[in-house]
């Protein structure tokens, strides 16, 4: 049984993490995507409205992106096909229904605590220090803190500074080989705040190196 847990694009490659017969794998794949354009000749490929289209197979992702840049603004040359190349790769590589072995997928639950001297911490100006982080994964509770704590059911990780605390978060996630990181409001507060504080202590390239694929992408969500 083979299944993926994460896919990402980096330059001209597709990066994939998953499990094959219960064993973790991380692959770097050279993917050759396809797109489609109208044709006057009969074709086995058709649009949802029955228009004949021809398949264009690219040698790599760069070629496909250049093609899109060249033709996407031309009204009389519509491009068909999935231009989300990650989705296209997944649909081709895992064409049948993916059977996941949930016992292999490692889920990490994270929560952080901040000081509140200046009120509730602000994502736009993360000026309140993170003083404690908890991570639960594979039945183990980690507590990363700058103050000694007696918690018999936890692994207390004592650090000397917030800078060290932030680095330790990613050390634990990497050592435990987490597939999924979750928690209460983790997408809208916890992780953005951690990254905001991390940038006060570390260069961007250092932070990128902590990630499973060696890079990260952040996006702004307005609510």
Feature-to-residue mapping (PLM):
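The two-metal-ion catalytic cores of nucleic-acid processing enzymes
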Residues: 1-223
């Amino acid at each position: 049984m083979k299944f993926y847990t994460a896919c990402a694009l980096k330059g001209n490659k597709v990066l994939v993490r998953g499990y094959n017969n219960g064993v973790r794998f991380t692959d770097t794949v050279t993917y050759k995507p396809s797109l489609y354009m109208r044709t006057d000749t009969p074709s086995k490929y058709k649009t949802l409205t029955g228009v004949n289209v021809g398949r264009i197979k690219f040698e790599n992702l760069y070629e496909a992106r250049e093609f899109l840049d060249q033709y996407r603004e031309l009204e009389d040359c519509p491009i068909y096909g999935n231009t989300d190349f990650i989705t296209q790769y997944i649909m081709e590589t895992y064409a049948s229904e993916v059977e996941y072995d949930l016992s292999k997928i490692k889920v990490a639950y994270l929560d952080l605590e901040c000081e509140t001297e200046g009120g509730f911490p602000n994502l736009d100006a993360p000026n309140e220090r993170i003083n404690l982080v908890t991570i639960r994964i594979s039945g183990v509770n980690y507590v990363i803190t700058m103050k000694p704590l007696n918690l018999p059911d936890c692994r207390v990780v004592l650090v000397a500074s917030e800078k060290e605390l932030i680095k330790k978060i990613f050390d634990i996630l990497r050592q435990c080989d987490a597939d999924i990181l979750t928690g209460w409001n983790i997408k809208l507060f916890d992780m953005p705040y951690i990254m905001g504080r991390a940038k006060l202590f570390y260069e961007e390239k250092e932070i990128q190196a902590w990630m499973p694929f060696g890079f990260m992408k952040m996006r702004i969500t307005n609510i």
